A protein has these predicted regions:
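NTP/phosphate- and nucleic-acid-binding module
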Residues: 1-37, 41-582
Length: 582
């Protein structure tokens, strides 16, 4: 069961684009005074922003719009492309201030519109041939959206939808959407007691005890894997002076997203990124070429101001921990170090059952620093590192940062959604700005290349992804609540239940006994709702035969094993970081 990414399919993109126009046509019929802003295709389908005056859409209004859309689709009008002059366009849309604003932003010359029946809209296209092709659609939700995304502007109404070629494809996608709702990390995070967010600290997650267990496991695993690869770990200040951020360039380009404070008549800022701190560590001592590569890792907490309307659980926050590492390398070490990073990424993502794709972003057309020769060599090194790591990659021409090319790593979760988490960014800028040097073999001082890289990205966001990826049913090694031992009778079997629990805790497992005077079914259901990885039921048979009956979270079937067999099974699952179903 996977959600479809509309943008990955050219035909599906056209179909959804045309369906957005069909929706706008239906809205115009139902609300003749409607004014329209834009209606783009997005990965989840399409949306259209509209001004309906005093009309505030309700959930039931979407059904009315759908009914009108079905009439339009049944009529099957052709979708016709036309070219008109800018002057004619201004005349055609003179009653719609939002379209006038768009038109005034266009260069002089002809403008394309697309027409279907009585409805016409500004659009570059392309579109499908007829609206009849858009009959398999669903309007998904509606929300508010500021015009041009500016909170100082008027609030418009946004309606989302999606369209497919066939009814079966639509139904499958809607089923996947329902599954995604059940897996919503905000919902599961609350039910499982993992995290909360207080009105007193918006965008700043508070991790609860079980959430801290999960977080600590992820961070310990990160430290273990990086230690194997020769990383050294640092911790840099959370607040540093304005002068540092001016030196790094963040003050010029990122000031509006930074939290600042005056201390002893001197301006400071809470760090939005960890990079400058790593550069201070590098410059704290002299370096020879023999010291390189130098791999500095930091699980560093950063703060970035985000608009309140953009905040979303663990996915969009104002403070998070970035699993940064900054590698200082010589040019001839670059390819090998990137290859090692990719191998590390592969090892970590595979543990979570997360396939991924790599995208190489190359030199922008203008505004970049460094010579073309350096860029070409750097891009080649990144590409060759992918090849030598046995990884395919796609090229994203011109999308590199001004200071260097990069590899973006996009993971795919169990619902087919793509998340950009890992990055390997080559930086030719900051080492120059901070005057970082090393003494080369010939005795001359040279500037190292710096690699910024993350694997999890944001630890908090990665936790949110994992909650939804696993639907809360974490593999045993990762689960905050691994076992609950449930005696059939709260008194008769409690001694044996405690024996089983003690055997589990002796192996370092997290286990409790639920011996409350409640019905067995109630206690089992509660453990299922809490997504305890294994529920272990013990009664007369288990007590007499030294066995346990185990049921895995999210499963209906149970199995009975000897206690020794069960303990060996559980230990192997933790040691091997086994994924369920593997």
């Amino acid at each position: 069961m996977e959600l479809v990414n509309v943008l990955e399919n050219e035909h599906l993109s056209m179909l959804n684009h045309s369906c957005a126009h069909m929706m706008a046509q239906a809205v115009k019929r139902l609300y003749p005074n409607a004014k329209f802003w834009v209606g783009p295709v997005i990965s989840e389908g399409f949306y259209y922003d509209m001004d309906l005056g005093d009309v505030k859409l309700k959930e039931e209004d979407l059904a009315k719009i759908e009914k009108e859309m079905k009439k339009i689709a049944k009529d099957g009008k052709r979708i016709v492309r036309e070219e008109i002059s800018k002057e004619d366009a201004l005349e055609m849309f003179k009653e719609d201030p939002y379209k006038i604003d768009l038109i005034n932003g266009f260069e002089d010359g002809n403008i394309t519109i697309y027409r279907q029946g009585e409805f016409a809209d500004l659009c570059r296209g392309p579109h499908v041939e007829t609206v009849k092709m858009c009959k398999n659609f669903k309007l998904l939700k509606h929300s508010g959206a500021y015009w041009k995304g500016d909170a100082n502007n008027k609030m418009l109404q946004r309606v989302y939808g999606i369209c497919f070629d066939t009814k079966e494809e639509l139904e499958a996608h809607l089923e996947a959407l329902e599954e995604a709702k059940k897996r919503d990390h905000k919902k599961l995070g609350k039910e499982m007691g993992l995290f909360t967010i207080s009105e007193f600290a918006p965008g700043m997650p508070i991790f609860l005890p079980d959430g801290m267990i999960l977080r600590n496991i992820l961070e310990q695993y990160w430290y273990q894997e990086h230690t194997k690869e020769g990383y050294q770990f640092i911790k840099t200040p959370i607040m540093m002076s304005k002068e540092l951020w001016e030196l790094s360039g963040h003050w010029d380009h990122y000031k509006d997203n930074m939290y600042t404070s005056m201390v002893d008549d001197r301006e400071f800022a809470i760090k939005p990124m960890n990079c400058p701190g790593a550069l201070l560590v590098y410059n704290s001592t002299l370096h020879s070429y023999k010291d390189l590569p130098l791999r500095l890792g930091e699980l560093g907490q950063v703060h970035r101001h985000e608009a309140s309307g953009a905040l979303n659980g663990l996915f969009r926050v104002r403070t998070f921990t970035q699993d940064d590492a900054h590698l200082f390398v010589t040019p001839d070490q670059l390819e090998e170090e990137v290859k090692k990073v990719l191998q590390l990424v592969d090892r970590i993502y595979s543990v979570f059952g997360l396939p991924y794709e790599i995208e190489l972003s190359t030199r922008p057309e203008s505004g970049y620093i460094g010579s073309e020769e350096i860029w070409d060599a750097s891009e080649k090194a990144l590409a060759q590192a992918c090849v030598h790591a046995g990884k395919e990659y796609k090229v994203n021409p011109g999308d590199g940062a001004f200071y260097g090319p990069k590899l973006d790593i996009h993971i795919k979760d169990s619902l087919g959604r793509v998340w950009q988490c890992g990055t390997v960014q080559l930086d030719m800028n900051l080492p120059e700005r901070f005057e970082c040097k090393y003494v080369d073999a010939d005795g001359t001082k040279k500037t190292p290349i710096m690699l910024h890289r993350v694997v999890y990205g944001s630890v908090e966001r990665f936790i949110g992804i994992l909650i939804e990826h696993f639907g809360g049913h974490f593999p045993l090694w990762l689960a905050p609540r691994q076992f609950v031992v449930i005696p059939v009778h709260h008194e008769k079997h409690v001694e044996y239940a405690n024996k089983v629990c003690d055997a589990l805790t002796a192996l370092g497992m997290r286990a409790t006994v639920d011996s409350r005077n409640e019905k067995l079914g109630y206690r089992v259901r509660e453990a299922q709702l809490q997504k305890v990885t294994y529920q272990i039921v013990v009664g007369d048979g288990e007590q007499e035969n030294n066995t346990v009956t185990i049921r895995q979270s999210g499963k209906k079937d149970s199995v009975t094993l000897s206690l020794d067999e069960a303990l060996a099974k559980f230990k192997a699952e933790v040691d091997n970081k086994t994924l369920f179903g593997k």
